[in-house]
């Protein structure tokens, strides 16, 4: 027994030494921010770095000679997908809810569009090879995250020209459970212990993301979880007190042993009286830092407010974002409409935005109807660099890119007429008709330059839209079938009775006829008059 215990200790020590000498590093970080409307934003980030790794050459995909991959901290299933399809950069986000930029500001992870968004960079010699690999990547990630990413086919796939530049160096959701399996410590230790599915999916907004970036030092995999919780709604009280146990129903009981660093940063509110517990060991630039790596204790970080929370009645001043977006699809008919976008510049300086609109083929743009107004004055000069990819019915979406210029402290309105397509009756979903969801538009601030425009700020996603298409009366065939079946059944029954029954004439004899006739209470003569004669009884 003693020998077995020593052997286990030797294995543990050897594994620790191997981890220290390994080329793989794992870090985790949690950022917490109290919002103006009483909510709290949480941003979990889990980074894994595989040093000295390079992407696979796409020319070697035809040969089955790729070396076997052995990982200690790097997710094996994800590494196999990256090698199998020779992916240079990958971004996948799954979000639910609407991010309120005006009240919450910019998120830590900019990809907050509603639904699923998948971006990948792949090198190749032919378009057919890239299309086949793209389909394989979609199916592989759909199986890995238990998500319906296979529906992101050619009808929902596009290649924007300028909106999504690669972030790394390019060389010469039930989704939460599979997400946690990609972490070295799973959800048994570290910050991942706070990821309670019941509380995350109950948040006002939540999203998970997977980001693979090839850097000069190696490949970096960043797994992120963002959510916005409302402590006032969860607690049922009028105070915005929050803690790990109250919002997640869990605490950080132990640190992840393989993490190089495990930190929690809490952005302290700029106003009000409150108390942060436990006492932060380091406060810098209004942010409290906690190091969970070297502390062997149970962590339940939170804040307490002595007074009741009062909801703000006006927008934050100054504005949390440089511009605001409102997007609508106008029109009451089911064959035509108008796309309307209202942009408000909250700053004094002129602002340029890179505008990307991706619509499924069921919505067609009329570019000659584009109108741009600035403070109710026609200003078509505020739009430039228009790029448009025509949609192909049942095959490719429409992609519209342009640069919009917003004068300082102004409101710019962009309008464009659209046409709504007619679908086949087999293309309508089998469930109740609620309309068709349209993806959000994306706006990226640009810096004005004498040579070119470079990305300046984070992307801003507009709310998604719902379009009402012409829907056939699916109840009419059922009514016709029921009416026809009723008529056929009635006629068939009558004809069947006529053909199967045998009619016989029965003649009754006079005696039997009299016996069978009912007796009468009064006697009558042949003339029908009553008998009035009397007789004596002796």
Residue ranges, per PLM feature:
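Edge strands and adjacent loops of beta-rich recognition modules
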Residues: 295-339
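Cytoplasmic C-terminal tails of single-pass
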Residues: 504-538
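Low-complexity, intrinsically disordered segments enriched in Ser/Thr together with acidic residues
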Residues: 133, 226-231, 236-247, 252-257, ...
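Short beta-strand elements of extracellular/lumenal beta-sandwich folds
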Residues: 331-359
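Cytosolic-side membrane-insertion boundary helix
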Residues: 417-488
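A surface/secretory-pathway sequence property marking extracellular, secreted
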Residues: 362-419
């Amino acid at each position: 027994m003693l020998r077995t215990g020593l052997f286990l200790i030797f294995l543990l020590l050897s594994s620790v030494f191997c981890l220290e000498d390994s080329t793989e590093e794992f870090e985790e970080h949690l950022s917490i921010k109290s919002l103006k409307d009483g909510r709290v934003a949480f941003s979990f980030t889990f980074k894994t770095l595989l040093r000295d790794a390079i992407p696979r050459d796409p020319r070697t995909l035809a040969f089955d000679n790729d070396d076997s991959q052995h990982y200690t901290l790097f997710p094996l299933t994800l590494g196999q997908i990256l090698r199998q399809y020779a992916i240079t950069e990958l971004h996948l986000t799954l979000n639910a809810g609407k991010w309120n930029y005006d009240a919450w500001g910019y998120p830590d992870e900019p990809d907050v569009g509603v639904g699923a968004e998948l971006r990948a960079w792949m090198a190749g010699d032919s378009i057919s090879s890239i299309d086949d690999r793209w389909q394989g990547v979609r199916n592989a990630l759909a199986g890995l995250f238990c998500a319906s990413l296979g529906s992101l086919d050619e009808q929902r796939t596009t290649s924007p020209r300028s909106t999504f530049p690669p972030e790394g160096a390019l060389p010469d959701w039930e989704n939460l459970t599979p997400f946690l399996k990609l972490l070295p410590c799973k959800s048994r230790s570290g910050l991942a212990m706070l990821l309670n599915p019941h509380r995350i999916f109950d948040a006002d907004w939540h999203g998970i993301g997977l980001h693979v970036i090839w850097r000069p030092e190696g490949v970096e995999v960043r797994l992120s979880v963002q959510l916005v919780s409302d402590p006032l709604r969860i607690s049922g009280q009028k105070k915005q007190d929050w803690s790990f146990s109250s919002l997640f129903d869990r605490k950080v009981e132990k640190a992840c042993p393989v993490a190089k660093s495990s930190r929690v940063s809490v952005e302290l509110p700029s106003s009000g009286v409150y108390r942060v517990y436990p006492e932060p060991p380091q406060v810098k630039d209004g942010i409290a830092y906690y190091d969970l790596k070297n502390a062997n204790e149970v962590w339940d970080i939170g804040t307490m407010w002595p007074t009741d929370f009062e909801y703000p009645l006006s927008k934050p001043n100054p504005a949390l974002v440089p511009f605001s977006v409102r997007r609508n699809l106008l029109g009451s008919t089911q064959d035509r409409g108008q796309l309307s976008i209202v942009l408000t510049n909250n700053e004094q300086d002129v602002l340029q935005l890179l505008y990307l609109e991706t619509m499924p083929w069921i919505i067609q743009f009329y570019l000659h109807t584009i109108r741009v107004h600035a403070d109710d004055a026609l200003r078509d000069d505020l739009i430039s660099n228009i790029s448009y990819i025509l949609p192909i019915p049942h095959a490719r979406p429409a992609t519209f890119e342009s640069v919009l210029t917003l004068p300082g402290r102004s409101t710019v309105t962009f309008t464009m007429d659209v046409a709504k397509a007619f679908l086949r009756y087999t293309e309508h979903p089998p469930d109740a008709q609620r309309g068709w969801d349209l993806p959000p538009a994306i706006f990226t601030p640009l810096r004005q330059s004498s040579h070119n425009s470079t990305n300046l700020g984070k992307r801003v996603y507009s709310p998604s839209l719902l379009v009402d298409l012409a829907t056939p009366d699916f109840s009419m065939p059922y009514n016709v079938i029921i009416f026809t079946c009723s008529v056929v059944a009635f006629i068939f029954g009558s004809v069947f009775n006529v053909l199967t029954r045998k009619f016989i004439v029965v003649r009754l004899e006079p005696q039997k006829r009299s016996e069978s006739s009912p007796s009468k209470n009064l006697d009558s003569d042949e003339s029908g008059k009553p008998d009035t004669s009397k007789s004596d009884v002796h």
